[in-house]
């Protein structure tokens, strides 16, 4: 590399958290030279809050990232110490994996993957300014005054934009505990026209393992079933060396919290925190204030890794003073002698209004400037990583001169996430939930590769052999379903006795294995006794069983998707003059001008746009086409 090339790159990624990692790796693997600027290169992919990946909806996102060619699932498999499948009894639409990771090893592994990629340079630097020229991004300036030039810039700053930590009435600037904040970049974004807001989040205290009495807590071991996040990895059973533990708060805990509320930066007499916090991950003082009737709340005591004695107190996030934290924690069963190694804290930070972005995550204000992760108003490692890979892919595709990758709401949770952000915006930290996805029975944990591998292959992040494997799987699933339709089972005493013993009604006439499998009491494995040629591939069997048992619901959902696609494919010109559209309400005009929806479908999802506005818009567009 020539010395002058050391400051010139194709893509510059600002930040090396979960969004930055996926963005950098995607762009680099698609053939572009990438610079990653991190406040601290030793905390790449850090898990500053819970040491876990996955959970409802979020676990599906991890698999979607994997199907697109991302890294989060693989690194989770490499570093996990405890893994479980959640919501097994609730059906396939809401099942999801959640793994405890060794957070130190996870970070080291991700750093290594960035450093060993020949197209990536990982470097320390706090970005202070975005450079632009004629409405197009040109590069960045760091805290040393160094100009780095890039054709595209991806901002993934997490909680670092003017980050401020709160512990009681003590407050100090930080991107997270022990790390410098980015104090000047927000000013640069505001100068470029970006609307900026303020959110807050928090994390619990960490306590020393030897000070915990696990004997009075409920043990939660890793799964007995072989599991893996990545479709590229072989599922395995982990040793039961790192269980999680469940305990609960009690009335004494809540009394201590109420006693110290006046010193809370959120509820105290001196209100220090103005930012809105996450609804679905409230602090313990939030729970005590808002749910006065609850006598206890769950606390999960989780290991942070193999080579550390620190445990994470999931459920005890707080910004109360240190003295209050000690008393509160020691009032909990099993934590009576707990030694705090790191105090809990709240952190307030800047985010941009994501309605200023296209669905590609490119800014509407500055060409080739992308944003991903918490800077867009989301919460969660998985949500950040999902945005990161999309931003990285789209930055690379634009530099190639190719069409962007925009995942629909009917295709992926990542599509739901990004559409919600750019269409509806955020007034609190956004967390993905299964309830946000209208088509969640189609967006399952088990079929992410069947849904998305084609896109990963198209952009060059998925190898040909894996894509062919997915196509083969799809073919074998369809062939097996057709075979089951053709295999008839005739009534007999033996068969009817078997069916009765399984809790289902006996046969009165010949019926196919396909129709028998629809019965809720029967599974593919129980039908093996009636099947002359059963399939032994568990992946095929799982897909066949879900598709047969839920056929009616799935078919209905596909019909709904067809209606959805009709409006999604009805394009709205970006430069449409909404003032020229007759009979549009003033509110509709204002919101349509701000969002500039790419389709009628997206316009329909903008809050405040009513059906008559949509009808008037369609009438106007139809007339323009004539």
From Swiss-Prot:
**Transmembrane stretches, by residue range?**
none
Entry keyword Isomerase: no
GO MF term list: flavin adenine dinucleotide binding
* Alphabetically ordered keywords of this record: Cytoplasm, FAD, Flavoprotein, NAD, tRNA processing
Q: What's the main place this protein lives?
A: cytoplasm
Which SMART domains does the entry mention? GIDA_assoc_3
The yes or no answer to whether the keyword Cytoplasm is present is yes
Q: Give the subcellular location.
A: Cytoplasm
Which coenzyme or cofactor does it need? FAD
Q: Where does FAD bind?
A: 15-20
Q: Which residues bind NAD(+)?
A: 277-291
| Pfam families (alphabetical) | GIDA (PF01134), GIDA_C_1st (PF21680), SAM_GIDA_C (PF13932)
Q: An example Gene Ontology cellular component term from the record? A: cytosol
Which BP terms does GO give this entry? tRNA methylation; tRNA wobble uridine modification
Domain of life assignment: Bacteria
Instruction: Enumerate the SUPFAM superfamilies for this protein.
Output: FAD/NAD(P)-binding domain
As for family, the record states: Belongs to the MnmG family.
Q: Could you tell me what this protein does?
A: NAD-binding protein involved in the addition of a carboxymethylaminomethyl (cmnm) group at the wobble position (U34) of certain tRNAs, forming tRNA-cmnm(5)s(2)U34.
Q: How does it assemble?
A: Homodimer. Heterotetramer of two MnmE and two MnmG subunits.
What protein is this chain from? tRNA uridine 5-carboxymethylaminomethyl modification enzyme MnmG
Biological source species? Thermotoga petrophila (strain ATCC BAA-488 / DSM 13995 / JCM 10881 / RKU-1)
Q: Gene of origin?
A: mnmG
């Amino acid at each position: 590399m020539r010395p002058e090339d050391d400051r010139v790159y194709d893509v510059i990624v600002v930040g090396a958290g979960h969004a930055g990692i996926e963005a950098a790796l995607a762009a680099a693997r698609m053939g572009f030279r990438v610079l990653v600027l991190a406040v601290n290169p030793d905390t790449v992919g850090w898990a500053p809050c819970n040491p876990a990946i996955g959970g409802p909806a979020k676990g599906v996102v991890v698999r979607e990232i994997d199907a697109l060619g991302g890294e989060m699932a693989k690194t989770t498999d490499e570093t996990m110490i405890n893994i479980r499948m959640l919501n097994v009894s609730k059906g396939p639409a809401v099942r999801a994996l959640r793994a405890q990771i060794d957070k130190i090893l996870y970070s080291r592994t991700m750093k290594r993957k960035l450093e060993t990629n020949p197209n990536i340079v990982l470097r320390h630097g706090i970005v202070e300014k975005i450079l632009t020229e004629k409405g197009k991004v040109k590069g960045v300036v760091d805290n040393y005054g160094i100009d780095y030039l890039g054709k595209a810039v991806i901002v993934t700053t997490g909680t670092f934009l003017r980050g401020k930590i709160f512990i009681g009435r003590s407050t100090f600037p930080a991107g997270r505990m022990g790390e410098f904040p980015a104090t000047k970049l927000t000013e640069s974004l505001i100068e470029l026209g970006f609307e900026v807001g303020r959110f807050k989040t928090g994390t619990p205290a960490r306590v020393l393992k030897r000070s915990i009495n696990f004997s009075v807590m409920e043990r939660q071991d890793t799964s007995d079933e072989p599991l893996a996040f990545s479709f590229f990895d072989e599922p395995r059973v982990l040793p039961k060396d790192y269980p999680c533990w469940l305990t609960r708060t009690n009335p004494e805990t809540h009394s201590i919290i109420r006693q110290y509320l006046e010193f809370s930066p959120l509820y105290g007499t001196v209100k220090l925190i103005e930012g809105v916090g996450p609804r679905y991950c409230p602090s313990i003082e939030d729970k005590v204030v808002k749910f006065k009737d609850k006598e206890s709340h769950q606390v999960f005591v989780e290991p942070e890794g193999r080579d550390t004695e620190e445990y994470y107190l999931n459920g005890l996030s707080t910004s109360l003073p240190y003295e209050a934290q000690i008393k509160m924690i020691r009032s909990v069963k099993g934590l009576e002698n707990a030694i705090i190694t790191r105090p809990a804290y709240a952190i307030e930070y800047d985010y941009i209004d994501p309605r200023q972005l296209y669905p590609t995550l490119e800014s509407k204000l500055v060409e080739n400037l992308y944003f991903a992760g918490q800077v867009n108003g989301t919460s969660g490692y998985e949500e950040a990583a999902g945005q990161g890979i999309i931003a990285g892919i789209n930055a690379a595709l634009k530099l190639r001169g190719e069409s962007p990758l925009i995942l629909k709401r009917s295709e992926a949770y990542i599509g739901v996430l990004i559409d919600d952000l750019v269409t509806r915006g955020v007034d609190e930290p956004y967390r993905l939930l299964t309830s946000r996805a209208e088509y969640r029975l189609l967006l399952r944990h088990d079929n992410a590769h069947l849904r998305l591998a084609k896109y990963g292959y198209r952009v060059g992040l998925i190898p040909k052999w894996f894509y062919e494997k997915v196509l083969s799987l799809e073919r074998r699933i369809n062939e097996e379903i057709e075979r089951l339709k053709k295999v008839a089972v005739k009534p007999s005493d033996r068969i009817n006795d078997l069916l009765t013993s399984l809790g289902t009604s006996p046969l009165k006439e010949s019926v196919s294995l396909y129709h028998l499998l629809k019965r809720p009491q029967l599974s593919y494995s129980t039908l093996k006794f009636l099947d002359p040629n059963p399939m032994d591939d568990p992946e095929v069997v799982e897909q066949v069983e879900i598709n047969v048992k839920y056929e009616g619901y799935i078919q209905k959902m596909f019909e709904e998707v067809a209606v959805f696609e009709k409006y999604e494919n009805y394009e709205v010109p970006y430069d449409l003059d909404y003032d020229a559209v007759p009979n549009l309400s003033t509110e509709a005009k204002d919101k349509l001008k701000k969002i500039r929806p790419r389709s009628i479908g997206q316009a329909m999802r903008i809050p405040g746009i009513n059906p008559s506005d949509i009808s008037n818009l369609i009438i106007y567009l139809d007339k323009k086409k004539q």
